[in-house]
Amino acid sequence: MALIDDARSVLHLDGVTDEGTVTRLNMLIDHGQAYLTGLCGAKLDYESDREAHALLMAYVRYAYNDAVEMFLSNFHDDIFRKQLNVAIALREEEANADQ
């Protein structure tokens, strides 16, 4: 399922296909991806990484409801856990590359 379809489902907008809503959701998805990538310090796979996907959908939900300023404080623990997982994965990649 595409991210836009997931966002529609999370927001209970499954049947909504008007151009304005779709454009807004795509913009929120793009902003969320950029924001989370910046926080985690690496590009995330929002399609297959369940943690990254869940964080992105939460960001979209908060942004859609004009509450994005609450996202970081409400998801601090989840974001921190993702940052640690990304850092560990990057460290392992570096160690494997050095061998």
Tell me the role of every PLM-derived stretch.
Residues 64-84:
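C-terminal structural segments of small proteins and small subunits
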Residues 1-55, 85-99:
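Conserved short "hinge" loops at termini or chain/domain junctions
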Residues 2, 26, 62, 73-74:
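Short linear motifs centered on Gly/Pro in flexible linkers and helix caps
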